[in-house]
Swiss-Prot record:
Protein name: Tryptophan 2,3-dioxygenase
Gene name of the encoded protein: kynA
Protein family membership: Belongs to the tryptophan 2,3-dioxygenase family.
Main function: Heme-dependent dioxygenase that catalyzes the oxidative cleavage of the L-tryptophan (L-Trp) pyrrole ring and converts L-tryptophan to N-formyl-L-kynurenine. Catalyzes the oxidative cleavage of the indole moiety.
Cofactor: heme
Quaternary context: Homotetramer.
Key word Oxidoreductase present: yes
Keywords: Dioxygenase, Heme, Iron, Metal-binding, Oxidoreductase, Tryptophan catabolism
Organism encoding this protein: Bacillus cereus (strain ATCC 10987 / NRS 248)
InterPro entries: Trp/Indoleamine_2_3_dOase-like, Trp_2-3-dOase_bac, Trp_2_3_dOase
Pathway membership: Amino-acid degradation; L-tryptophan degradation via kynurenine pathway; L-kynurenine from L-tryptophan: step 1/2
Reaction(s) catalysed (UniProt annotation): L-tryptophan + O2 = N-formyl-L-kynurenine
Length: 279
């Protein structure tokens, strides 16, 4: 037996899987790897599909971690939440790199299969919408996009009505004794969050006395990390779109780059940014 064959067939490596689960079976690779179905015969459409499917898988993990972190904070278990939120940031950094790969798609290549997309657009990504909802950017009007699928629409409806990460972070301030205005605590959580002076004052006190409020300070910084990464993702999205289609209208009907530039101004945790100026 050749030396390289000896390495591959090292003693103890399992080779008989007639009655045992394989790696491919555990990951359901047959199903996963058969889901890349091009609607054109253009070579580069495969790149487009794989990039977006991979991003959706990462977003599934982001939601898994965000929901667990929200429940953990509700139960006053901040330390486990820190680990989950730190993982979200790492996932975000990974997704951002995918834009570098998609940017290898030139305008001439994309135009060859763009019409195959019809009105399908990343704007319709329900997982991205759920991430926005989980972070507190609620857009009730967007639910109409998902009416085609009643089960999916119900999931989005549930996500819209659930407390966001920032909602439970503000509740953590209340539990620590900070006086948060009742309008914030009793607000309609299906609507976008609007910044509040009492919330800002609370975070300002947290940042002014880090030792006393260490856990709240750590929570605040984890939130800033997530929003920072999300804004970087949005910027790379906008520049990649501009690089590939310029200022054409998006397939989903948006104004394309102009819309993506406006989105950059959306904030999830406004008071946490404001305190940096006031410290």
């Amino acid at each position: 037996m050749k030396e390289n064959e000896k390495i591959i067939m090292e003693k103890g490596i399992h080779t008989d899987f007639k009655e045992n689960m394989t790696y491919g079976e555990y990951l359901q690779l047959d199903s996963l790897l058969s889901s890349q179905k091009r609607l054109s015969d253009h070579h580069d459409e495969m790149l487009f599909i794989v990039i977006h499917q991979a991003s959706e898988l990462w977003m599934k993990l982001i939601l898994h971690e965000l929901y667990a972190a929200i429940e953990s904070i509700k139960q006053d278990k901040l330390q486990p939440a820190f680990k989950m939120l730190a993982r979200v940031s790492k996932i975000q950094s990974q997704i951002i790199q995918s834009w570098d790969i998609l940017a290898t798609l030139t305008p001439s290549e994309y135009i060859e299969f763009r019409d195959s997309l019809g009105q399908a657009s990343g704007f319709q990504s329900y997982q991205y919408r759920m991430i926005e909802y989980a972070l507190g950017y609620k857009t009730p009007h967007a639910l109409k996009i998902y009416e085609k699928d009643p089960e999916l629409h119900a999931r989005l409806h549930t996500a819209l009505h659930a407390p966001s990460l920032y909602d439970v972070a503000i509740q953590a301030l209340v539990k620590e004794g900070f006086p948060i205005h009742k309008d914030v605590l009793n607000r309609d959580i299906t609507q976008p969050y609007e910044e509040d002076a009492t919330v800002e004052a609370a975070w300002l006190e947290v940042y002014a006395d880090v030792k006393k409020y260490w856990n709240l300070y750590q929570l605040a910084e984890k939130l800033i990390d997530i929003e920072d990464w999300l804004q970087q993702w949005r910027f790379r999205h906008m520049k990649t779109v501009e690089r590939i289609i310029g200022h054409k209208m998006g397939t989903g009907g948006s104004s394309g780059v102009s819309y993506l530039k406006r989105v950059l101004d959306q904030r999830f945790f406004p008071e946490l940014w404001n305190v940096r100026t006031k410290l």
